[in-house]
Structures are given as C-alpha cells and as structure tokens.
Amino acid sequence: MSDSSQQGVPRVGVIGLGAMGQGTALALHESGLAVVGYDVSDRAREAFAAQGGQSAAEPAALVSCDIVLLLVVNGEQVEQVLFGEQGLVGRLTPGSLVIQCATVAPSQARRLGERLGAAGLALLDAPVSGGAAKARAGQLSVMASGDAAAFDQARPVLDAMAATVYRLGDAPGVGSSMKLVNQLLAGVHIATAAEAMALGIRLGLDPDTIYEVITHSAGNSWMFENRVPHILQGDYTPLSAVDIFVKDLNIVHETGRELAMSTPVAASALQQFTAAKGAGFGREDDSAVIKVYQRLSGIDLPEAANDPQGHDPKGNAPGGGA
C-alpha cells in the first residue's frame, strides 16, 4: 500500500492522457487525490506534468495504485493495457479496482468483468460523456455499472470527475450498453448537423444565420449547437475525432447485427464518417464530416475549413459537374 492509501486517500492511476484523460486526471489531482498519469505520448505526459501532475514513463509504474482509470481510445487499447506484454493484470494488488471509461461493446465489458474477477480485481464499467471542457472541470456524466463494492471503492474518483453518476446495474456491460445508445444519437446528430449546414449553404444561406435560426428553432440539437461553431470558425482541432465515430458507430452496427436488429439511420451516419476518414479527415474534429459534402457538392465552407480538393468558388462539384 502507498503512503497515501494508508492515510485514507486512494492512489489513482490514469491511463490515457488525451483530451478527456488529461482533463480528468487534472480534476482528480486538484481534488486532493494522489494521481499518477500515463500515456504512450511523451507530449501528453509532459503536458500533464507541466500542470502539476505526476506522470509515469511506463504503465508498470501504476502497479501500486489502488484504482486504475482507463481513458483510452478503444477496446484494443483496453486489452493491451490490461493483458498485453506490460499489462497490469497480474501486477496490480488483488482487490484493486479498474474503472473502464472507454466506449467498448457491451459484450467486451461483460467479458472484461469476468476476466478481472478471475484475477482478483474489481471492475466498474463506467463510460463517460461531456467533452474535454467538462472533463477538465470534473463535471462529466458517467454511465456506470458494477457491484456495490466497486461503486463504494470508486466513490472518491467519481465524486471528483463527475457532475452526475448514473448507477445503471450491478454488473459490467450495462454502462457500456447505455453509452452505445448515446453514441448512436451523438454520431447521427453530428452527421445530420453537417448535412443540414451543407444543404443550407448550397441553397445560398449565410452559415452564421443558419446557426442563429436553427439554435432557436425546433430542429436544434445539443450536437448542432456544440459542433457547428467549429465549422463556422474553420477550426478542426480535434476535441473528438472523426475516427472516434467510425469506431463507435461500427460498434453500434456490430451490436445490432448480434441482436438481429437493423440500425439503418446509424448505418447512414457511419458511411458519412467512413467517407470522411477515407478522404483523410480521420484525425480532424468530428465536425469535419461536413467536408464530405464539400467534396460532393463544391460548397464554400467558412475560412480555413475549405478543403482544397473539394472547393470550387463557382459552387460546382469536383470534376466540373454543373
């Protein structure tokens, strides 16, 4: 046990110091918890350390932690962190808690709970939502499931990182199921917002006026209101990338297939994000899905948003179509 644990303050490891992980780790640190952060990126670790956090050069430095928070990108990274060559399973002290926050398939979350349980470790299936700003403020929404002991053990961390914790069930998989519903809606809303803006621009409407009117009308959505400003500013710095929704909507599709349930609206959004990824925009902000419409219809996007391969000031589609 670490000194901090002996004094009643759990030692918390955060793996994944990207947009969400960096903010969450800093919120935990500023709440008084003993936090050590790890990321494969030197730049991410240095940024965390520059803001007062303690960073580690390798995952093995987190084996003394009582709680490990996973804020990685996907299920493959979860597997690598826990069961890979430098994996924490088998190194963490029995009774330690893993809080898994990545968006993964519900079936993977259930299997993960079984495997960690067999290793003497507890799992809280706890995907998050809210974005980088809320992560930094410790104001995330957490969709969690796990047994009562896991919730009790996680309480200091959840109190520091979340505005709302939804306690959804007593076993892993329920939290990930709810997150999948959220991601279906989020992905569809972003793709629809892009299509609506593209149509309005093609009709000759002023982009800023579209935003002003729609955000005060029944067609508004949280994603429209949050993402369209990125388009208006021509700023595609990724807060959540196109690649994320290619991954998440693929999980929606695969889960629907397992359940013999069609998800045609989500499938359409997935195709648009996949097209954006194929066009080279995978690492840009998810609002860059609008650039697919630019390439197809030649619309003139605001300022730096313009894609040189798709932009035609006469409004013609690429290839010279009328």
Predicted regions mapped to residue ranges:
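Beta-strand segments within the central parallel beta-sheet cores of soluble alpha/beta enzyme folds
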Residues: 206-216, 267-271
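NAD(P)-dependent dehydrogenase/reductase Rossmann-like domain
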Residues: 278-322
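Active-site-proximal catalytic alpha-helix in oxidoreductases
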Residues: 137, 142-144, 166, 172-203, ...
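NAD(P)+-binding Rossmann beta1-loop-alpha1 motif at the extreme N-terminus of oxidoreductases
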Residues: 1-71, 96, 164
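Interdomain hinge/lid region at the active-site interface
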Residues: 176, 185, 220-287, 291
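Rossmann-fold dinucleotide-binding core
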Residues: 103-183
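Rossmann-fold NAD(P) dinucleotide-binding segment
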Residues: 59-71, 75-121
